[in-house]
């Protein structure tokens, strides 16, 4: 079978990583087309990859006959139009989060995809492909902790881009814990509340940081998340699940734990998301490529998962303003098997 020909749209940090990943570490695929809103950047990336060329218009890149599948690493505001083009051209697509930037358009994408014979959209929630998260999921599903009752999460970044505001902590950071909650517990989130502690003096004036998110699932499980994106330290992601017969935690350390001055200890902390989750990204893309080549098109989070995350985050942004718990309202999930197709 010939290699899957992939168009990578958006070659900033994430997109350029995907080009390098597909070119050097993924089997059964190659990058045939790249696109970016900065054409010179796309031309530079294309010149470094054999058999790759830059296409100026992202919709032309999707429609290109030398493209079998698409990776979207473009700004979220462009996703709706690009996803619609992928559906129109029946091109499987790996879409980095968010699915779209609002709940209504995310739901419309879900409904349109459900009208097709096979799903085409996979959403890039990479933690589902991380070795530690997969082990934690297996532990829960195997019943070793008994009924999971509570989950505690930490999500810290050393810093954020200049355009970041308080709502993006919910939409860009908390969204990962939202998907982790749904993935680990296998149920939807019923409500979300954002609590605002004393803000970090080092945070930009327009950013309320840290924030504490409190999620409640439909069965009543409690999840709390510390979101602190201006620590100035490192990238820290930890998750602890407490069950009726014990608990389990991941993300405690990276590398050597050392003893130094009396009464202290320490180790290495991942400086960024690529160091912490680089292997998960590799696994995610390889499994997606394998699924597309096999004709199933997805092996991971679906368009519905992207929509559900958007709905929870929308409730979170509302709670950020009010400080109160906000219910999450989800539409009925479309059933592909019951939809009549012309």
Features from the language model and the residues they span:
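A contiguous active-site-proximal alpha/beta segment in oxidoreductase catalytic domains
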Residues: 100-160
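Contiguous beta-strand/loop segments that form the cofactor/metal-binding neighborhood of enzyme cores
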Residues: 172, 176-255, 282-295, 331-342
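Beta-strand-loop-alpha-helix segment that lines the small-molecule cofactor/substrate pocket
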Residues: 69-76, 80-125
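N-terminal Rossmann-like dinucleotide-binding module
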Residues: 1-49
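Conserved SAM-binding strand-loop segment of SAM-dependent methyltransferases
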Residues: 51-58
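Mid-domain beta-loop-alpha active-site segment that forms a flexible
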Residues: 124-132, 155-190, 208, 217, ...
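Active-site loop of classical SDR/Rossmann-like NAD(P)-dependent oxidoreductases
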Residues: 17, 37, 273-286, 301
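C-terminal helix-rich "cap/oligomerization" subdomain common to oxidoreductases
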Residues: 1, 69-72, 290-342
């Amino acid at each position: 079978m010939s290699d899957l020909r992939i168009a990578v749209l958006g070659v900033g940090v994430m997109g350029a990583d995907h080009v390098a990943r597909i070119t050097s570490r993924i089997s059964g695929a190659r990058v045939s087309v790249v696109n970016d809103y900065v054409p010179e950047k796309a031309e530079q990336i294309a010149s470094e990859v054999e058999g790759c060329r830059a296409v100026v218009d992202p919709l032309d890149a999707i429609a290109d006959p030398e493209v079998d599948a698409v990776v979207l690493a473009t700004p979220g505001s462009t996703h709706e139009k690009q996803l619609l083009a992928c559906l129109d051209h029946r091109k499987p697509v790996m879409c980095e989060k968010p699915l779209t930037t609002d709940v209504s358009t995310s739901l419309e994408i879900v409904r349109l995809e459900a009208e097709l014979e096979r799903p085409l959209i996979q959403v890039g929630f990479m933690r589902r492909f991380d070795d530690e998260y997969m082990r934690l999921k297996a532990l829960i599903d195997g019943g070793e902790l008994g009924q999971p009752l509570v989950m505690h999460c930490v999500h810290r970044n050393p810093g954020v881009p200049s355009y970041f505001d308080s709502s993006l902590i919910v939409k860009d950071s908390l969204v990962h814990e939202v998907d982790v909650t749904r993935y680990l517990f296998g149920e939807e989130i019923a409500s979300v509340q954002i609590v605002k502690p004393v803000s970090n003096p080092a945070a930009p004036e327009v950013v309320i940081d840290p924030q504490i998110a409190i999620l409640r699932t439909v069965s009543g499980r409690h999840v709390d998340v510390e979101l602190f994106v201006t620590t100035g330290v490192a990238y820290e992601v930890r998750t602890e699940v407490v069950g009726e017969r014990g608990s389990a935690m991941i993300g405690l350390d990276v590398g050597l734990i050392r003893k130094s001055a009396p009464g202290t200890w320490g180790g290495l902390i991942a400086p960024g998301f690529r160091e912490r989750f680089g292997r998960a990204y590799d696994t995610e893309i390889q499994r997606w490529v394998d699924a597309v080549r096999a004709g199933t098109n997805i092996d991971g989070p679906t368009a519905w998962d992207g929509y559900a995350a958007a709905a929870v985050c929308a409730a979170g942004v509302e709670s950020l303003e009010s400080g109160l718990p906000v219910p999450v309202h989800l539409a009925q999930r479309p059933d592909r098997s019951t939809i009549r197709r012309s």
